[in-house]
């Protein structure tokens, strides 16, 4: 081969190889951004219920409210988000009116639903300025209200969300969003709620998606970053995003401060990780796609627009993606059952029912994804709080047999032989989180009827040793029991041998798809081959040309 030809082919191979290498890296980053490799660590209040619903109940006709709550429960929803306005409950400094809040809370409890209560909207006597959602002039006024609320309803309420959309001017009473002022409000309110209800879980306000960086609106990720810089992290337990899909579906994997899409939640998650707060979950206080009916004559949607069939499909696909890829995501509250808005308001495009109360396709999609009986990638405690006043019990999908006991510590093996646990998971691996100590006991584990492939075996099967290595020192550890499984559904069976009174089983972690599937490895190999061949041809061609 002539040197000039060899050099030309070398340059071509080298260029193509580098191009493929760059494209492969970009595709890998986009495809796996936001995922967790290996076994996800314990993150409280993540996982199921993955799907909730926003309801606007305050001031609603009581019969309509009770009917709506029952219909929502029949869809399989167990957790709802509801706004209770400070302005209506404390209209004057020394005047309290709990009557409507009492009715709302009683109806929610009667329907068997768990509320996430959103507190906000200053009364005129306390407001910094006149207008909806105006912040208080003195944060301590709001904190005193929140403490009174928690003292009154703390036995019924676990989750409290402090304000809504403080990063927008409409969420801050028409004023300029002020992270420092919100941080002060959050600190005072969180401390007051926790003083009245030590078990309270505090949610950061839902941060609205916007690409603006001031002065009137501040990007969600930037507002969150400033809260961390202001030292507000100890005042909240959960971050809340609003990953509306706008005009693209849940598989739009662009993660960009200038792009509004479902993947925008990853931007906020990356801020949390950057500030060392990855041990907390991210929830979605609002999300969804807007589908106004054909012939709509009201105001246009500012959230993009899809048709009803696409809306329903996107809801299903979004939940599937979250369960498969985002183990850090907790409950996502779909917007909404029905808006508290006139009939020409575009928020009706999010509604699960039409103005006549008929279910829309989105409601059926919600029903299809509401119950997560299969454990998807993420961490799951062995026991979770049950209905108010009934302690702890198994998470949905876990089938315990025998004399197991449940508490905040996990699941405790009974004294009699025969305690078993079965569940189905979707993923590529399983790890058990166990409490080892100075006792002799084992858990025998099989996956799809075969001994778990990461455990030692004896005649009975694959076993996990519950005795701590030095016998005397108790420890809680996550032990991989099965890895390298094909991604899909797998059935686990666990049998306990001894170990009562030790609360041995703390939880389990499901591994998802790894960030290196075959087709990307192939592309990487071809690109490296092209680079290598191109480099060799180029060098040998140059050597020949000099002779």
What spans do the regions from the language model cover?
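Short, acidic/polar
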Residues: 59-74, 141-150, 217-229, 312-321
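Hydrophobic faces of well-ordered beta-strands that scaffold small-molecule active sites
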Residues: 49-55, 80-82, 115-119, 160-162, ...
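Noncatalytic carbohydrate-binding groove/subsite architecture in carbohydrate-active enzymes
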Residues: 143, 177-309, 352
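Glycan-recognition surfaces in beta-rich domains, encompassing non-catalytic CBMs
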Residues: 17, 369-546
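N-terminal carbohydrate-binding accessory modules
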Residues: 4-11, 19-79, 91, 106-110, ...
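Substrate-binding cleft and catalytic face of glycoside hydrolase catalytic domains
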Residues: 75-216, 246, 289-294
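Aromatic-rich peripheral "rim/lid" segments of glycoside hydrolase catalytic domains that contact
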Residues: 11-22, 26, 30, 37, ...
């Amino acid at each position: 081969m002539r040197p000039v030809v060899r050099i030309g082919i070398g340059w071509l191979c080298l260029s193509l190889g580098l191009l493929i290498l760059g494209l492969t890296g970009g595709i890998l980053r986009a495809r796996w951004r936001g995922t967790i490799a290996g076994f996800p660590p314990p993150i409280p209040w993540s996982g199921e219920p993955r799907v909730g619903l926003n309801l606007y109940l305050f001031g609603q006709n009581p019969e309509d409210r009770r009917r709506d709550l029952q219909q929502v429960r029949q869809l399989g929803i167990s957790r709802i988000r509801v706004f209770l306005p400070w302005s209506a409950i404390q209209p004057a400094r020394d005047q309290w009116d709990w009557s409507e809040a009492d009715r709302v809370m009683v109806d929610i409890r009667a329907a068997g639903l768990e509320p996430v209560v959103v507190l906000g909207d200053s009364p005129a006597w306390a407001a910094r300025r006149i207008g909806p959602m105006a912040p208080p002039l003195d944060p301590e006024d709001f904190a005193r209200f929140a403490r009174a609320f928690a003292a009154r309803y703390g036995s019924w309420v676990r989750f409290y969300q402090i304000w809504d959309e403080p990063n927008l001017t409409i969420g801050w009473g028409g004023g300029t969003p002020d992270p420092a002022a919100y941080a002060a409000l959050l600190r005072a309110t969180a401390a007051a709620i926790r003083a009245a209800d030590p078990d309270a879980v505090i949610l950061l306000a839902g941060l609205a998606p916007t690409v603006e960086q001031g002065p009137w609106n501040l990007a969600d990720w930037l507002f969150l970053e400033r809260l961390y810089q202001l030292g507000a992290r100890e005042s909240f337990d959960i971050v809340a995003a609003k990953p509306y899909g706008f005009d693209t579906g849940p598989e739009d994997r662009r993660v960009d401060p200038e792009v509004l899409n479902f993947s925008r939640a990853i931007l906020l998650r990356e801020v949390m990780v950057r500030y060392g707060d990855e041990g907390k979950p991210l929830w979605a206080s609002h999300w969804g796609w807007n589908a106004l009916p054909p012939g709509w004559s009201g105001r246009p949607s500012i959230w993009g627009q899809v048709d009803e069939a696409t809306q329903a499909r996107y809801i299903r696909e979004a939940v599937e993606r979250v369960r498969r890829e985002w183990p850090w995501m907790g409950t996502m509250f779909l917007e909404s059952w029905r808006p508290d808005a006139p009939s020409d308001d575009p928020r009706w495009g999010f509604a699960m029912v039409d103005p006549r109360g008929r279910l829309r396709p989105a409601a059926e999609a919600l029903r299809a994804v509401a119950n997560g009986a299969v454990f998807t990638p993420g961490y799951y405690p062995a026991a979770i709080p049950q209905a108010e006043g009934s302690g702890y019990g198994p998470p949905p999908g876990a089938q315990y047999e025998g004399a197991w006991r449940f508490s905040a510590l996990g699941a405790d093996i009974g004294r009699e032989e025969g305690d078993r646990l079965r569940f189905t998971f979707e993923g590529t691996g399983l790890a058990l989180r166990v409490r080892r100590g100075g006792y002799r006991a084992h858990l025998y584990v099989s996956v799809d009827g075969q001994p778990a492939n990461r455990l030692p075996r004896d005649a009975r099967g694959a076993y996990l040793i519950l005795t701590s290595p030095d016998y005397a020192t108790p420890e809680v550890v996550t032990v991989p029991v099965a890895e390298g499984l094909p991604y899909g559904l797998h059935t686990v069976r666990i049998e306990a041998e001894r170990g009562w009174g030790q609360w041995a089983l703390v939880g389990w972690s499901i591994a998802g798809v790894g960030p290196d599937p075959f087709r990307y490895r192939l592309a990487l190999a071809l690109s490296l081959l092209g680079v290598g061949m191109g480099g060799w041809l180029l060098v040998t061609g140059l050597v020949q040309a000099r002779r």
